[in-house]
Amino acid sequence: MPETIQRQRLAILGLGKMGSILMQAFRKQNVVQAENIFATVQHAERAATLASKFGIQVTTDNRAAVADADIVLLCVKPQVLGDVVQEIAGGIRENQLIISIAASVPTAYIEKRLPEGIPVIRAMPNTPSMVGAGMTAFCCGVSVKHRDLEVARTLFGTVGEVVRVDEKHMDAVTGLSASGPAYVYMILESLAEGGVKMGLPRDIATQLAAQTVLGSAKMVLETGDHPALLKDAVATPAGCTVDGILELEEGGLRVTLIKAVVKASQRAKELLFS
């Protein structure tokens, strides 16, 4: 962890679902002290409620929140990000780091709305961040320095794994790891339904399916083996698994999942921000 990050002041603009997940992780792991977190929401009543609940400062004033911040985390929707950046631009200082988690919004879009030389990082976490098992990919704008990278790695490392990619790959990240949990939930749900169809109680079927998905993913990560090799190790000759795989192949599982990632990635590209 960068030595000074605990003492840095963090502004979180947009304390919605992901903003709240990140803020609570920062607090829980003492990456940023509660008294140094300033967040914003749209309504004063909600600001008061969240301030009382989490022990941080919450306001409806974006400019006030960023005034003394060292790090500004933009957690607002892509459709309003431009307005928010223009709102705070006049109060941004040279040594502040801007991190955006808005899908499809390039670093250049943010940079040209801020004073020249402001470091901007674009990140894409996913919802398993809620349980500390998230996957965040990030890329850097033109003015980002090494210490800024380390800050980003530290912050997003509180909610899971972190990887740096070239910005040209960020739309693919959106289609794969950001949207991916929804695909996995559908697969998990279908596995459990198959168990129910064969007579298992629903709660046990769901537990079996969830742990199977979790354990299989862990084997890929910890062994480093290609998924195809791990699959083949389960599919013994003339066994039950081969019959199951045949059904999946006939149903087009592989092609359907590939097309889902491609389609979601293409949709991310269509949301042009310039």
Annotate each PLM feature.
Residues L22, H43-E45, K53-F54, N62-A67, ...:
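Rossmann-like NAD(P)(H) cofactor-binding subdomain of soluble oxidoreductases
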